[in-house]
Structure formats: C-alpha cells, structure tokens
Amino acid sequence: MPASVWKDDAARLRLEHWYERFLARVPGPVERRQVPTRHGQSHVLVAGRADGPVVVALHPMRAGAAHLLSELGPLLAHCRVVAPDLPDQSVRGLQLRLPLADDALARWLLDVLDGLELRAVNLFGVSWGGFVARLTASTALERVRRLALLVPAGVANGSHVTGLMKMAVPMIRWRLRPSDANLRRVLDPLFTTWDREWSDYVAGTLRDMPMDMRIPPLASDDALRRLTMPVLVLGGAEDISFPGDAVVRRVTAMAPHADGELIPGCKHSPPATEEFREWLAARLRRFLE
C-alpha cells in the first residue's frame, strides 16, 4: 500500500537534512547504492572495513540507515556493514507500507540481499529492524548465518497501559507547549541517556512524520524454534516497550542455539555513548567469531 514517511514537502526536506546530518557522523567513507527489489529501487548504505565480515544491519522505526551507522562506529573498524533503509520507516526508504502479518518485509529484504549478491549473511536488527531481521531468519533460515537482535520488536510486548500513562500526557503537554523540558518528559521513558542531536531529531519526526500505530505481531513459538542458526538477543532491563527480561527469556527458551543478555539500566533506546558503542561492537564481534 502506498504511504509517505513525511507529512509534506517541507517535512521531507527537513527529514533529508537530518539523514545527511547523521550520515556525516559515520566514520570513514560510506557508499550509497540503489538495489532493485520487487517493490522498486531500495536505498542501501555500505560502510566499514572492506575486507571485514559482512553484517547486514536493520535500523529502528522512524529512523534510517544513516542513523544506525552513526551509532556503529567501533564496529565499522572491524566489519563491513550493509544498512538498507527500511520501507515506510526512513525518508530514504521505499514509500510503501508493507503488511506486518505475513512475510512481505522478509521477501523485500531477500530481494535486497539478492541485488547485492549476498547469499548467507550475518543479520543484526534493532527494535523494528529486529522484527524484520527475525522475520527474515524464520522465513529463509538458509540466508542467515548468524542473527543478532537488540531490543527487538515482535517477541514480547510491554503493557500498553503503562506506556500510555508514561507518554500520553507528556506528549499532549509537549504539543501544546513544545519546550525542551516537555520534550524531555516525552522521551525520558524511552531514552537511556540524553543526547541533544537524537532528541532534536525525534522532536522533528513528531512534527514531520505521520504516526504509524501498528505494532509488529509477536512471533509464534514455531517461528522462534525455526531459528536454528546461532542467535544473540540483547534486551533492555528497563525497556517498557519490549521488556528485556521477557524478550531474552522467550528467545533463549525457543531458539535452540540462542544466547541472551539483559543490559542493565537500558531503556528502549540504548545509551548514545561511546562507552556503549564500544561495548556493543565488542559483543557483536565475539558473537560473529
């Protein structure tokens, strides 16, 4: 179904500016590619060590490949990271809303891998990107060598009532009076650490991107059991969206070769600090070895 990530042309330009701003934070050269898929040309960024192991990285909702790469600097020193822009979530992605209840997003990603001539890959997904990564691995397990998930959607959901209580009133207050203090109240349930650039970007998306209220469906037990490749799942101990303890417990109980870790103090948006970036890169490298 056709969809638009932006509300109007002015919003699109602002979102494109933010995309380039995050892209400028990525260390080293970044290659831009257009890859054919059944739904049209898809935008992909490629960065990192040219002879390193390939990792396909999928970004969270309402962000983009540039945003994720900007947080993976230490990993880029060791790995070749391929980051597609997801449909209906990024200003550089396909303006197309694919269904969540079937394998449409997985088929799109498999088209991207085919276009890049990548047969079997290491797959890493964050939040919404974690849902797409898990879905792809369950759909075509022969295409995924190893699967890493960070605060993934589609495994275990938090309380909608709790989320509403913590965010709805601050959101209304911020929309009526968009001050920095009110923005902090909106984002505090989600952000582990306060980052000026990320907070300003999210404020921009609240103004410029339509809200997509869909929640990825929970994976069935059978879908998780089909994950026969090595799996690493990292959950946020204070994630109200997708509670880390439930996420880690479910994946490690169902996937036969899964390892899980609960990140202390981590909300849904992990720390935007160099210390966490270094920790994540080291954890992923150990998993890939």
Language-model features: locations:
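Alpha/beta-hydrolase fold catalytic core
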Residues: 1-53, 78-79, 274, 281-289
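Conserved HGGG/HGGXW glycine-rich cap/lid loop of the alpha/beta-hydrolase fold
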Residues: 43-91
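Active-site loop/oxyanion-hole signature of alpha/beta-hydrolase fold enzymes
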Residues: 83-124
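Flexible "cap/lid" loop of the alpha/beta hydrolase fold
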Residues: 131-138, 145-174
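Conserved alpha/beta-hydrolase catalytic His-Asp/Glu region
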Residues: 158-163, 174-228
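Short beta-strand/loop motif that positions the catalytic acidic residue
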Residues: 227, 233-235
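Acidic catalytic loop of the alpha/beta-hydrolase fold
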Residues: 238-242, 269
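Catalytic active-site module of serine/aspartate enzymes centered on a nucleophile-bearing elbow/loop
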Residues: 257-289
